[in-house]
């Protein structure tokens, strides 16, 4: 305990010093900055030799300290998640790497998913990224990405082959946004190899326009997480693409040749010892094409590497989007928008680079949301097995405080997290947390290692006092059933007013976790349509004020019962959630106020809206649609 406190103090002191240094005119060499940036008790930022055993930060599980009394502690959850994928028609096995053994790390990362209303009928469809295997497939039998159309009865129809999305390869992440502002949301999919930009034709089909859009890459890259964002606020969606490892299979050592091990088990080599990739930023030129501005925008001036997932949001309340990147085995990256077309990595100064005791973690997934309802966006990040997941609370001054242990997320360290999302599972107006787990190495099955390839999920209920309660074993069979999960998306696919999840798994059919609730609480959904801002409204911030009957225990007296959320192109691990923003309202009878801050700077205010309705709101404050959603006539 003494050393833990000492580490925290030193970590805070270093962060404070770096923050103050950034405000001075002192100029240091890159070498000096890196010396200051290295954790007091952490690992050195050096290249590990090829063939070294995988080094992952270890954290002891620890219960949270006693917090303020919570009105929900010990009360029934009131919701159950049930996997209805097969009954709903999601019967296609998703492929990724070897089933029992992998030669390369390439075979381990898995794919993302999207709840994606591609036909604009306000019923969520499902897109699943698919993968590949080293040995390949016979012609005509290649696994391809899948698109499932919502039948509005709880089931889906596979429309992949006529959609134009049947692309094969080592698929990774997906993100959604209307890059050409034609009113139809488009789809970007990252790959190990060439990425793919699919333009929505507005008739149920897509056209791949990667080359025409200027996104064709001149070399082999392992592209990872992606996000559309309007970083320069010109009304056109730009594109961020993370890069994991600069991987050449011809030169990457095999496990048995390089003695690559995990807890004594021979496994795929890396990422330590392998060259990290360089993240990419493409500026939308406004004519349907993009320009690579990665280097001049500051994407390559980072301490951390091995990028996996990302999240783009206004994390410092400046009105400009920043980018947070979960890096594997190195410090995280936090690109802060300089408002001049460039970014600076300020992860260390902001306190989001390392663990509480200043060590690099193996980050996987990222979700952003205001869990304590203080009007500032926080970050939750999944990490490797043996470590906690991370919860960073926004302090409002451009920095964050690691509240993992204080909030109750430090009790679990055994499972390996991938997908993650802030999600109001019970519509009480407070963001809960869902985590999808699954080990990276199939080789752990059948060994003496305390791990399994397929793992259950974590479900944390928000106690409204800054802490969470682990209710994983009470969340239903969809939570407790083991799965080889990777990315998942969140959305209300059956329009019944509660949030569901679709989970992409490796070498298995996906999961469709339907949320069955007995609570009958209020909610409101808001979909935005930009005019001066990008058409999708990505980057817009929505504030909802309603008397939810659930006091803000962590707020100052007199604080209104407000929630905030932003429209984002990606969420969790490699995935894209519903672009309709969902607010749980507990017992509220009406919405007192909706305030929308658009990327253009315009602010719209609407008052006295009804609950349990979908509102489609155009920039300028015009309500294009106001309807009560009719739940699916459930067959599944």
What are these language model-derived features?
Residues 1-41:
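N-terminal secretory signal peptides
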Residues 11-13, 32-86:
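C-terminal segment of N-terminal export signals and the immediately downstream linker at the start
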Residues 14-26, 156, 206, 290, ...:
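N-terminal export leaders
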Residues 67, 79-80, 88, 98, ...:
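Gly/Ser/Thr/Pro-enriched helix-cap/hinge segments flanking short amphipathic alpha-helices
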Residues 80-94, 98-100, 105, 157-169, ...:
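Short loop/turn motifs that recur once per blade in beta-propeller domains
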Residues 110-120, 149, 171-181, 199, ...:
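Beta-propeller blade termini
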Residues 126-130, 186-191, 239-243, 322-326, ...:
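Hydrophobic beta-strand segments that make up the repeating blades of beta-propeller
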Residues 130-140, 245-273, 436-452:
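Short, conserved, GDST-rich strand-edge loop motifs in beta-rich repeat architectures
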């Amino acid at each position: 305990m003494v050393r833990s406190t000492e580490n925290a103090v030193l970590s805070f002191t270093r962060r404070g010093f770096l923050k103050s240094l950034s405000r001075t005119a002192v100029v240091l060499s890159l070498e000096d900055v890196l010396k200051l940036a290295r954790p007091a008790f952490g690992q050195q930022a050096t290249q590990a030799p090829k063939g070294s055993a995988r080094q992952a930060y270890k954290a002891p599980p620890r219960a949270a300290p006693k917090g303020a009394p919570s009105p929900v502690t010990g009360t029934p959850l009131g919701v159950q998640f049930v996997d209805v994928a097969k009954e709903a028609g999601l019967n296609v096995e998703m492929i990724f790497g070897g089933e029992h053994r992998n030669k390369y790390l390439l075979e381990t990362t898995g794919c993302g998913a999207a709840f994606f209303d591609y036909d604009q009928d306000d019923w969520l469809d499902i897109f699943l990224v698919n993968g590949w295997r080293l040995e390949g497939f016979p012609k005509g039998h290649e696994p391809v990405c899948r698109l499932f159309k919502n039948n509005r009865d709880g089931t889906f129809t596979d429309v992949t082959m006529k959609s134009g999305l049947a692309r094969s390869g080592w698929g990774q992440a997906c993100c959604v946004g209307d890059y050409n502002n034609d009113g139809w949301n488009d789809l970007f999919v990252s790959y190990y190899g060439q990425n793919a930009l699919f333009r929505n034709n507005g008739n149920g089909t897509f056209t791949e326009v990667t080359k025409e859009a200027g996104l064709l890459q001149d070399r082999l890259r392992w592209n990872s997480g992606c996000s559309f964002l309007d970083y320069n606020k010109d009304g056109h969606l730009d594109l961020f693409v993370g890069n994991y490892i600069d991987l050449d299979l011809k030169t990457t050592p095999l496990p048995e040749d390089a003695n690559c091990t995990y807890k004594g088990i021979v496994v795929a080599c890396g990422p330590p010892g392998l060259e990290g990739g360089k993240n990419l930023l493409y500026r939308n030129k406004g004519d349907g094409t993009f320009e690579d501005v990665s280097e001049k925008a500051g994407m390559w001036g980072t301490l951390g590497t091995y990028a996996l997932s990302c999240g783009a949001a206004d994390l410092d309340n400046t009105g400009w989007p920043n980018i947070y990147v979960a890096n594997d085995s190195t410090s995280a990256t936090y690109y802060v928008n300089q408002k001049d077309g460039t970014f600076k990595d300020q992860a260390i100064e902001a306190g989001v680079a390392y663990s509480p005791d200043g060590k690099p973690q193996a980050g996987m997934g990222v979700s952003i949301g205001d869990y304590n309802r203080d009007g500032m966006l926080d970050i939750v990040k999944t990490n490797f097995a043996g470590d906690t997941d991370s919860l960073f609370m926004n302090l409002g001054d451009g920095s964050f405080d690691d509240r993992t242990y204080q909030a109750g997320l430090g009790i679990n360290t055994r499972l390996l997290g991938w997908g993650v999302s802030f999600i109001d599972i019970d519509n009480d107006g407070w963001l809960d947390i869902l985590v999808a787990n699954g080990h990276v190495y199939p080789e752990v099955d059948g060994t003496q290692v305390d791990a399994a390839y397929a793992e259950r999920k974590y479900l944390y209920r928000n106690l409204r006092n800054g802490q969470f309660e682990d209710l994983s074993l009470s969340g239903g069979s969809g939570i407790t059933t083991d799965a080889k999960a990777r990315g998942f998306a969140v959305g209300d696919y059956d329009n019944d007013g509660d949030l569901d999840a679709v989970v992409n798994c490796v070498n298995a059919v996906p999961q469709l976790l339907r949320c069955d609730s007995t609570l009958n609480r209020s909610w409101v959904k808001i979909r935005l349509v930009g005019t001066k801002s990008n058409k999708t409204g990505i980057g817009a911030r929505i504030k909802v004020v309603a008397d939810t009957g659930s006091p803000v225990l962590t707020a100052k007296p007199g604080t209104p019962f407000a929630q905030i959320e932003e429209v984002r192109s990606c969420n969790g691990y490699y995935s894209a959630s519903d672009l309709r923003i969902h607010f749980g309202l507990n017992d509220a009878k009406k919405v007192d106020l909706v305030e929308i801050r658009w990327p253009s700077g315009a602010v719209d205010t609407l008052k006295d809206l009804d609950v349990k309705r979908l509102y489609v709101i155009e920039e300028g404050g015009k309500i294009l649609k106001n309807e009560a959603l009719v739940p699916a006539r459930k067959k599944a």
